[in-house]
Structures are given as structure tokens and as C-alpha cells.
């Protein structure tokens, strides 16, 4: 079985050197993507042929996006996006459970300080998105930021410096 589509969720606000992301592109030798056409030559999911690798930046630090903090509202925003993408790819989710998880999403939930407590032992290195793209010699097109990041900004929440440059 080969992967038809890769989804990468990236924490926009994490500034720990150890947690800098490894961005992907179709040219990566280590990524073996399946042909987006099914056995009959028809697209398995029509949108996959347009975007086989989807990388999306979400508000928060590593555990805000992936979960693990007491207020997991931001993690549920990210989980909601994953569930939506999975359904677009043909995965059937239990509607009641999907709706309950979507209801837990809070795009204005707090962004935790990843350098607090034991996290303070990690090296601090502010994330420069454009430098990450250049460093990895990626051809990923425009950087994609989840719409919840923009809604946070409109609601008066702080924004990552790289996003503020886009405004």
C-alpha cells in the first residue's frame, strides 16, 4: 500500500530549535506516493491529483497543534482539519463523534509557552518560515496558513511575525 496524500500540520508559534519542522515536497526521495488514479485509471479522490502533499500552518506550539495541554481547543481545530481531509479521501467517520470533536475546537484557545517548565531546556530559536523553505530547497508554492490563524488575528489575538508580514 502506498500513501495517496500526505498531510503535515505545522505549529506556527513553536520557537524551540528541536521542534523546527521538516517540510516536504514531491521531489523528496524518501516520499513514495501512490499514483492518485485508482486501479481503473479514475481519480480515487479528485482533489488529490491537485495537492498530494498538503502542509498547513496552525496557530500554537507543538502540543497546541497535536494536543496535550489542558485546553486543547487549538488541537481540536487541527484535528477537525485532519478529519475533513480524511473524509474527502473516502474515510467514513461516525457523524456523532465527528460532530462532538468539531464542537471542541476553539481557534481562540490560549497558545501555551513551550519553553515553560522543562521546555525551558530546549534551545530557543525563533522560526523564520521563509528561511525554512529556502534551507530545504523546497518548491512548495505559497505557504498555507489555516484560516483559523487569520480569524484569531481579526479577533485581536497576537500573530506570528511571519504572518503579520503577509497582512
Please tell me what each predicted stretch does:
Residues 1-167:
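Active-site- or binding-pocket-proximal scaffold segments within functional domains
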